[in-house]
A protein has these predicted regions:
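Transmembrane beta-strands of outer-membrane beta-barrel pores
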Residues: 55-61, 110-114, 118, 178-182, ...
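Outer membrane beta-barrel
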Residues: 98, 102-262, 266, 588, ...
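Membrane-embedded beta-strand positions in outer-membrane beta-barrel channels/transporters
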Residues: 48, 90-94, 158-160, 220, ...
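Solvent-exposed loop segments that connect transmembrane elements
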Residues: 62-79, 117-145, 197-206, 249-306, ...
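Detector for outer-membrane/organellar transmembrane beta-barrel domains
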Residues: 86, 341, 348, 460, ...
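Short loop/turn motifs that connect adjacent beta-strands in outer-membrane beta-barrel proteins
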Residues: 34-49, 60-64, 95-104, 162-174, ...
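Outer-membrane beta-barrel "beta-signal"
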Residues: 665-677
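Transmembrane beta-strands of outer-membrane beta-barrel proteins
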Residues: 47-55, 104-108, 172-174, 233-235, ...
């Protein structure tokens, strides 16, 4: 009995389970180069080795947008001026061997990026206003973690043994080891049916990347059984959890300086606290009022507001899934798929820990501060606060934050306190907070998919439902702003509202909630055949959507109602508003067109291609797919020679969605050359 399948013959990167990056390029499956084949023991053992070596470059062609410069997201932007940002040497090799009904498959890869490993970056050229990076004090270098993840690496990807048997006239196949799953039908958008394998964004960004290098294999036992000629069942159990590797801090496409590899410190610019920097150092050294000490305010008003601690990883067990696929011959041999997966989050939410901080004696600090402040310092503090020196002196004796004066500030983040005592408490609290990446466990996914043909078109679609999807609540800067503006009350043992949660000393903040979520995808791959002067031409279109239910998507903050953060992570405290936050419904589409001219010259084939991506309505949650108004396109040309040598050049432009689009100034040109044997 033969297990039937209607899977499409085209692959795309990052394809199934991939990131929804606007610069996605189709990696078409052309004819494969002849691998090195071998056999032993009178052909009882056979196998092959398939190797690809490549060289690639990525060039920034758009200058830095000075408005794209948040202190906790801007390392990647400041690190690279226009010019070469990545130069990669890479090798990937596949080994497969089989004996009778059994076999083994191993894939390994290694790369080296000279721009990360051997060069200084351009941070100092762009350091205006002056801010520390995650590499401080060596701001023009990359962190050790970034160098390891994005600069060089060598690892085994897939590594599994497999077997094929007949059990009771039913064909059975099984795999044991590190493997990639290909469930569902979606191509360009994540959070669909195929959710088992994480994605390595550092690999995806490398010039010349391939989907087989981007999807992270997971350790699992899986099997497939042909129950009937038309019905099959597949199941797996995963015993080692792995996370998605987002762009490391300081790399060209990085979106966060905190919650990716290489992040260590959250900062805020608090110029109102500059006059208190020396006073804080002196009082904390003397142990006044329980001040813990630590990094103080630098001359530009930059202050540490949290340390980034080790991840809170999900457990290794408890991830499993089952799928049934049915070929309905009476419906034009349409394939239907039905899925269930229980998995742990691959992308993090924010966790903050206040448990190690014991608080302050603000009365003792106020007494010392009042005597220590010179008239010059008092004038500077009063000027920053916009009040008279007499008014400042009136509140110096008050150890708590004056709410009337606080409300008078036009920028709550950069004017967190209105008196010296509150300012000293703010500096101290910020030195003690620890934030971490938290990966939520036990997410359930129920899915349905179909795949059929209509004339020359392959038509596909899928629907996934998660009754308990974790999504972020507050934007990063709103969490930090809530902390800073209420630091004196918190230090005094009071209860404060941070990101909609009532917390006090000793508490933890889990910045997520669970909601019902539906994700849909509908698309087609159309083969035009010889058309418009091409020997072959095909197009791809995919429409995707996200729908959140079972929650109002808003929370009560310290100063009114806020909506949950959107995909752009724009904060209310930084001037973003309701239109920038999450919506219950969000939509986007991707279009691809590619043609081929065969044998243009002496065995050389040319394949021009174009990709257009548009998020046309609604904002996703923080780890979703869509930012309303965001657009991108890529145009390029691929040349291949005798199915072994390939070269490609492409141009990508990102635009739309205003300040929410963190990639809006990352236009680039990429080129690569590959040789397979």
């Amino acid at each position: 009995m033969e297990i039937k399948s209607r899977k499409p013959v085209l692959r795309f990167a990052p394809a199934k389970a991939g990131f929804a990056f606007a610069g996605v390029l189709p990696l078409l499956v052309a004819a494969q180069a002849q691998a090195v084949e071998f056999s032993f023991a009178d052909n009882e053992i056979t196998g092959s080795i398939d190797t690809t070596i490549s060289y690639g470059q990525l060039w920034r062609v758009q200058g830095q947008d000075k408005t794209n410069d948040d202190i906790n997201t801007n390392d990647g932007n400041r690190n690279f001026d226009t010019g070469l940002v990545s130069e990669v040497f890479k090798i990937t090799s596949d080994l497969e061997a089989s004996y009778q009904n059994y076999g083994v498959f191993i894939r390994g890869t290694a790369f080296y990026d000279t721009q990360i490993m051997d060069k200084r970056n351009d941070y100092y050229d762009a350091n205006s206003p002056a801010q520390p990076s995650q590499s401080a004090p060596r701001d023009n270098s990359f962190t050790r973690e970034t160098r390891h993840k994005a600069g060089r690496d060598a690892q085994i990807l897939d590594a599994y043994v497999y077997g094929n048997w007949d059990v009771g006239n039913m064909p059975v196949s099984g795999r044991f080891g590190k493997q990639v799953f290909n469930w569902g039908e979606g191509l360009f958008y994540r959070n669909g049916v195929n959710t088992t394998n994480p994605v390595d964004a550092a690999k995806f960004r490398l010039p010349g990347s391939e989907v087989k290098e981007v999807l992270v294999p997971v350790e699992a036992l899986s099997f497939n059984i042909g129950l009937t000629d038309n019905l099959s069942m597949e199941a797996f159990y995963q015993w080692n959890w792995k996370e998605t590797a987002i762009d490391p801090v300081g790399t060209y496409f990085s979106e966060t300086d905190l919650f990716a590899d290489g992040g260590n410190t959250a900062y805020s610019t608090q110029r109102a606290l500059i006059p208190l920097g020396g006073l804080y150092s002196g009082l904390s050294a003397a142990g006044i009022g329980g001040l813990q000490g630590g990094r103080t305010v630098d001359g530009n008003g930059n202050i540490k507001v949290a340390s980034v601690g080790p991840d809170i990883n999900a457990k290794n067990d408890g991830q499993f899934g089952v799928a049934f696929r049915y070929i309905a011959e009476e419906l034009n041999s349409t394939e239907f798929g039905f899925y269930f997966v229980n998995y742990h989050a691959k992308e993090p939410t924010i966790y903050a820990d206040l448990g190690a901080y014991t608080g302050l004696d603000l009365g003792a600090i106020a007494g010392q501060a009042q005597g220590a402040l010179t008239p010059q310092v008092q004038q500077a503090v009063a000027a920053q606060a916009g009040i008279s020196v007499a008014a400042l002196q009136a509140v110096l004796a008050d150890p708590t934050l004056n709410p009337t004066l606080a409300a008078a500030y036009s920028n709550a983040l950069t004017n967190a306190v209105t008196n010296a005592t509150g300012g000293l408490a703010t500096i101290d609290v910020a030195n003690q907070v620890n934030v971490r990446r938290e990966y939520v466990e036990d997410i359930r996914m129920y899915g349905f998919s179909f795949n059929t043909t209509v004339g020359n078109a392959s038509v596909f679609g899928e629907l996934s439902y998660r009754p308990n999807l974790p999504i972020g609540i507050a934007a990063t800067n709103d969490l930090l702003g809530d902390l800073l503006t209420q630091a004196p009350q918190l230090a005094a043992g009071g209860i404060v509202n941070i990101g909609g949660q009532q917390v006090q000393l000793g508490d933890q903040i889990h910045n997520y909630t669970r909601v019902e979520a539906f994700n849909t995808s509908l698309g087609t791959i159309y083969n035009f055949g010889p058309s418009f002067g091409f020997d072959s031409l095909f197009g791809v279109a995919e429409l995707a959507s996200e729908h959140l239910r079972g929650d109002s998507l808003q929370y009560n903050s310290r100063n009114g109602t806020r909506y949950y953060a959107g995909r752009g992570n724009g904060s209310y405290i930084s001037g973003y508003d309701r239109d920038d936050q999450v919506n219950k419904n969000a939509y986007g589409y991707t279009l691809v067109l590619s043609g081929t001219w065969n044998d243009v010259y002496a065995g050389v084939n040319l394949s021009p291609f174009a990709v257009f991506k548009h998020d046309f309505e609604g904002n996703s949650h923080q780890t979703g797919n869509f930012i309303e108004g965001r657009k991108a396109y890529t145009v390029g040309m691929r040349a291949s020679y005798l199915n072994s040598l390939e070269a490609e050049i492409q141009y990508t432009e990102f635009y739309g969605a205003g300040q929410n689009n963190g990639a809006r100034d990352r236009d680039n040109i990429g080129l690569n050359v590959k040789y397979s044997f």
